[in-house]
UniProtKB/Swiss-Prot annotation:
Family label: Belongs to the G-protein coupled receptor 1 family.
Alphabetical list of InterPro entries matching this protein: GPCR_Rhodpsn, GPCR_Rhodpsn_7TM, Olfact_rcpt
Pfam family, one: 7tm_4
Recorded GO CC terms: plasma membrane
Keywords in alphabetical order: Cell membrane, Disulfide bond, G-protein coupled receptor, Glycoprotein, Membrane, Olfaction, Receptor, Sensory transduction, Transducer, Transmembrane, Transmembrane helix
Cytoplasmic side: 47-54, 121-133, 218-237, 293-298
Record topology, Extracellular segments: 1-25, 76-99, 155-196, 259-271
GO molecular function: G protein-coupled receptor activity; odorant binding; olfactory receptor activity
Subcellular location, principal: membrane
One GO term of the biological process aspect: G protein-coupled receptor signaling pathway
Gene: OR5AK3P
SUPFAM superfamilies: Family A G protein-coupled receptor-like (SSF81321)
Described purpose of this protein according to its UniProt entry: Odorant receptor.
Official protein name in the record: Olfactory receptor 5AK3
Length: 298
């Protein structure tokens, strides 16, 4: 490995998990099954929505794109993670690391905005049902989804550009199972203050903005539901967004654990565990959540 700057680094060594050898095969099988189940579930949900004319509505247009995003970001990290269990030296080229980080960051960010958009969709469906067809027109929901992809691409491009323009002279060993931002920054011998600021500003804004949209949407939704006189009406309205609320709770609960836990000696290992749940388990759960809680999706 070169010692000068980032252009001299040709590859990184992904350290993966600090687990004993006898458990590696078990983890490999479990994570492989989760990944395959995730692919089957999300591809199946996309095909179901595409082929069933009853599901050609904004309420199912958004989960369709959520499934696509889940496929993309879990596929960006899981194959390389599985490789870490089968190879002693799990290497990734510099270019491969850049691409993995870019793809993962793009779709992980888009995921946040899609969940916020889906909360807004639930708000309009429950709080303004008579105006729903006018507000959530085909043009509007296509623009909203396109916007989530654009924001994800811009966010990821900025982070990728600033991260991989650094000088790496400490080591080429990334203490993670994929090319994630903070473990990569830990290898740099450059001043990373601007990178930390970008992380705080971009990631902080993305999380806070989307969380606030979701929180305020559900505040209005709950107020509207509580005002309903009919028990059946309340139940029907709540079931409309129950699947989304479940998905959001799991998604942001995991992110909160990842980014808000206090720093400690085992915090990096905890981050790896949370990253597994965020990057592999949640994409598997989403199609199950939507299919079980929506009668049309069964």
């Amino acid at each position: 490995m070169g010692r000068g700057n980032s252009t001299e680094v040709t590859e990184f060594h992904l350290l993966g998990f600090g687990v004993q050898h006898e458990f590696q095969h078990v983890l490999f099988i479990v994570l492989l099954l989760i990944y395959v189940t995730s692919l089957i579930g999300n591809i199946g949900m996309i095909l179901l929505i595409k082929t069933d004319s009853r599901l050609q509505t904004p309420m199912y247009f958004f989960p369709q794109h959520l499934a696509f995003v889940d496929i993309c970001y879990t596929s960006a990290i899981t194959p390389k993670m599985l490789q870490s269990f089968t190879e002693e030296n799990n290497l990734i080229t510099f270019r491969g690391c850049v691409i993995q980080f870019l793809v993962y960051a793009t779709f992980a960010t888009s995921d946040c905005y899609l969940l916020a958009i889906m909360a807004m969709d639930c708000y309009v469906a429950i709080c303004k049902p008579l105006r729903y067809p006018m507000i959530m027109s085909q043009t509007v929901y296509i623009q909203l989804v396109a916007g989530s992809y654009i924001i994800g691409s811009i966010n990821a491009s900025v982070h990728t550009g600033f991260t991989f323009s650094l000088s790496f002279c400490k080591s080429n060993k990334i203490n993670h199972f994929f090319c994630d931002g903070l473990p990569i920054l830990a290898l740099s011998c450059s001043n990373i203050d601007i990178n930390i600021i970008l992380d705080v500003v971009f990631v902080g804004f993305d999380l806070m903005f989307t969380e606030l949209v979701i929180i305020f949407s559900y505040i209005y939704i709950m107020v509207t539901i509580l005002k309903m006189s009919s028990t059946a009406g309340r139940k029907k309205s709540f079931s409309t967004c129950a699947s989304h609320l479940t998905a959001v709770t799991i998604f942001y609960g995991t992110l909160s654990y990842m980014y808000l836990q206090p720093q400690s000696n085992n915090s990096q290992e905890n981050m790896k565990v949370a990253s597994i749940f965020y990057g592999t388990v949640i994409p598997m759960l989403n199609p199950l959540i939507y299919s079980l809680r929506n009668k049309e999706g069964k």
